[in-house]
Amino acid sequence: MPITISGSTGVAGVDGSAGTPALQGTSTTTGIYYTTNVVAGSVSGTQKFRLDSTGIYAPANAAAAIIGLTDAATIAVDMSLGNNFSVTLGGNRTLGNPTNLTAGQSGIIFLTQDGTGSRTLAYSSYWKFPNGVTPVLTTTASAVDAIIYTVRTTTSITCNYALNIG
């Protein structure tokens, strides 16, 4: 397909599709393509992302990595690293106020008891739970609990929890 340069207005005639993207790397089925008011990307002929006038759309099978946190007296969470986190508690801890918060960010923090168990977790001021009641973690050795969160503002994280999930 030829590319037409339209003066200072941009490039035209490069629409493509998921199976034959307009802009390709070494694979002819991987790249970026365009449709009306849409920019999308494909890998091996399958659409992996789509950006249109409503925002970014991710297919149902999209997944985010679970980022390991460092166990410490105050557990630090850098929200710029991802959305989902995991830590094994090696003692009674505090979940610190995260850095790099973005309103609307959401995810899960998995909390695992170490082999001893009976570890407790306190929460710094940004973490907000229903009715102001923080969860009491499952104390069984190796138990897993989860904090489900959405960042409301840069100083307020709305949370809920799931206890003893595995």
Language model: regions and residue ranges:
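Short, intrinsically disordered N-terminal pre-domain segments
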Residues: 1-15, 163-166
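Beta-strand-rich receptor-binding modules of extracellular spikes/adhesins
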Residues: 2-10, 27-59, 156
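Extracellular/surface-exposed low-complexity repeats and stalk/linker segments enriched in Gly/Pro
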Residues: 10-30, 90-94, 126-134
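Short, hydrophobic/aromatic-rich segments at coil-to-beta transitions
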Residues: 16-22, 37-38, 80-84
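Residue-level marker for the onset of beta-strands and adjacent loop->beta junctions
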Residues: 19, 28, 37, 47, ...
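Extracellular beta-solenoid/beta-roll
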Residues: 56-81
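A mid-sequence, solvent-exposed acidic-amphipathic segment
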Residues: 77, 85-88
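Acidic, glycine/polar-enriched metal-coordinating patches/loops
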Residues: 87-166
